[in-house]
Regions:
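RNA-binding basic/glycine-rich loop and surface signature characteristic of RAMP-family CRISPR effectors
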Residues: 1-298
Length: 298
């Protein structure tokens, strides 16, 4: 495994949606998620991490060290069993093996981190190991992300659609078309903030510089292999990276996030934004604390 990263990072992702549903809420008929008090649109961290996993799986294709643990339709205990097999352990013998080898917990954790990119990055709860009373069942990952929130309120719209195809023979006799509906956000610019702990990378998962570059690549291409009619047009517009010159960091994260401002290109224009060109993104680099540098990727 490569050497773990040595610097703490924070980052800001700015992405937008045009005539699409960035993250439907199953409790609200799959409407776009909205903060009911402010009208600001929301996209969950789980949604964004899923897209990062999907990108890595697409470009790495299960290459050694870059497999994905949390996959659609794949039982987690199937991957857990691989760790047992690699260390010559079974569910029946695990407790006896643990008495023989006090480092068994760490060995299993290290094997999972070395083989699965998303565990090394985001951490995981591995139920098989929790049930076996192993301390490696919960791994806290060095990369953490919050909810994305739109810069301005969004107004989701319900669009009625028709379908010429008929489902049953009875429907064919009674009607010519079927009705459906879909939800869209006409336009929204979303901001997500994230954190990368070099301390956790060193102590726990071994998240490396190579992993870090893959993470940045995945974020910049978050929606490039995820297009669908439901999501409309989505794109990552900017990735703003703050790098500390130490493992534990040189300043609180909120002070760095506060240097990133998103304002209207024409402040006097009160009409709803409909494109990225309606906004201006600035970073007050002069206000950055000593020991912190900023990089902007697009």
């Amino acid at each position: 495994m490569s050497e773990a990263i040595k610097n703490r990072y924070e980052f800001v992702i700015l992405f937008d949606v045009e005539n699409g549903n960035p993250n439907g809420d199953p409790d609200a008929g799959n409407m776009p998620r909205v903060d009911p008090e402010t009208g600001l649109g929301l996209v969950t961290d789980v949604c964004l991490k899923r897209k990062i996993r999907n990108y890595v799986e697409t470009v790495k294709e299960d290459a050694t060290g870059y497999r994905i643990y949390i996959k659609d339709g794949v039982p987690l205990n199937r991957s857990d069993a691989e760790a047992y097999a690699a260390l010559d352990v079974t569910e029946k013998t695990v407790k006896a093996k643990k008495k023989e080898n006090p480092d068994l917990d760490r060995n299993i954790r290290d094997w999972m981190c070395a083989n699965f990119f998303d565990i090394r990055t985001f951490g995981a709860v591995m139920t098989t190991f929790v049930k076996a009373a192993l301390n490696c069942g919960q791994v806290r990952g060095p990369v953490q992300m919050g909810f994305a929130r739109s810069v301005e309120p969004v107004v989701p719209q319900e669009v009625t659609i028709t379908r010429v195809a008929i489902t049953t023979e009875a429907d064919a006799e009674n009607k010519g078309t079927e009705m459906g509906r879909k939800y869209i956000v006409p336009y929204g610019l979303y901001r997500c903030e994230g954190y990368i702990s070099a301390n956790l990378a060193r102590k726990t998962t071994g998240f490396s510089e190579k992993d870090l570059e893959l993470l940045w690549e995945a974020i910049l291409n978050l929606f490039e292999h995820d297009h669908s009619a439901a999501r409309g047009k989505m794109a990552v517009r900017e990735l703003i990276i703050f790098k500390h010159d130490s493992e534990l960091g040189c300043a609180p994260a909120h002070k760095l996030f506060d240097t990133v401002k998103v304002t209207r290109t024409h402040p006097e224009d009160i009409t709803p934004a409909r494109s990225y060109q309606d906004y201006v993104v600035t970073v007050d680099e002069a206000a950055l604390p000593e020991g912190v540098t900023c990089e902007i990727r697009q």
